[in-house]
C-alpha cells in the first residue's frame, strides 16, 4: 500500500481525476515527472525569470516561485483559460502564427532568462532562437520532447 499512498499524497491520483497536474492540495504542478519537479524546484530562486513556449499548470507553478513568467500560447481557448488564473507576475501572449510564436523571445535581451521551457508548437525553431536568451547558468527544459 505504500505505492498507493505515494500516489495519493503526491497528488497523482487527484491529477488523474481532475485532468490537470496538481498536488495533493490542488496547487498547480508542471506536467513533469515528480523527480524532475523536485530537481527544478531545488534550483529556483525568487529573482528568476522564466520564458515558456506553451502555457499551462507550469505557468501558475513557476509564478508562485519566481519573479517573472513570460509565456506565449498558440491555442486561443487555452490562452483564455490560463489568463483567467494568471497572477500579476505572468505576461501571457497569444500568437497563433508559428513563426511569430517562436520569435516572441526576441523581444528580450540576451541573457535575460534563467529558465526557458519549450513545450508548444514549432519546437525546432524555438530551440534555435532561445539559447542566447539564457543566463550563463540557465536551463532549457524540453517538455514532451517526443511531440512534433
Language-model features, listed with the residues they occupy:
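Class I SAM-dependent methyltransferase Rossmann-like catalytic core
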Residues: 3-47
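SAM cofactor-binding core of SAM-dependent methyltransferases
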Residues: 31-99
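Short coil/turn segments at beta-strand junctions that form active-site/ligand-binding loops
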Residues: 46-48, 67, 111-113, 136-137
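Short catalytic-loop micro-motif centered on adjacent basic/acidic residues
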Residues: 49-52, 71, 114-118, 140-142
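Glycosyltransferase catalytic domains, chiefly GT-A lineage
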Residues: 98-106, 139, 145
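Active-site glycine-rich loop that binds ribose-phosphate moieties when present
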Residues: 101-103, 120-123
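A short acidic, Gly/Pro-enriched loop at the edge of an enzyme's catalytic core
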Residues: 105-115
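C-terminal substrate-binding/active-site "lid" region of AdoMet-derived donor-dependent transferases
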Residues: 115, 121-148
Amino acid at each position: 500500500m505504500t505505492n498507493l499512498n505515494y500516489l495519493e499524497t503526491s497528488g497523482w491520483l487527484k491529477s488523474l481525476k481532475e485532468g490537470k497536474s496538481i498536488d495533493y492540495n490542488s496547487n498547480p504542478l508542471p506536467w513533469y515527472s515528480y523527480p524532475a519537479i523536485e530537481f527544478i524546484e531545488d534550483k529556483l530562486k525568487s529573482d528568476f525569470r522564466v520564458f515558456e513556449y506553451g502555457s499551462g499548470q507550469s505557468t501558475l507553478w513557476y509564478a508562485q516561485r519566481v519573479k517573472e513568467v513570460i509565456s506565449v500560447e498558440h491555442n486561443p481557448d487555452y490562452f483564455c483559460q490560463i489568463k483567467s488564473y494568471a497572477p500579476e507576475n505572468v505576461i501571457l501572449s497569444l500568437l497563433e502564427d508559428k513563426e511569430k510564436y517562436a520569435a516572441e523571445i526576441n523581444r528580450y535581451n540576451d541573457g535575460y532568462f534563467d529558465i526557458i521551457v519549450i513545450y508548444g508548437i514549432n519546437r525546432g525553431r524555438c530551440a534555435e532562437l532561445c539559447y542566447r536568451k539564457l543566463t550563463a547558468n540557465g536551463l532549457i527544459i524540453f517538455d514532451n520532447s517526443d511531440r512534433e
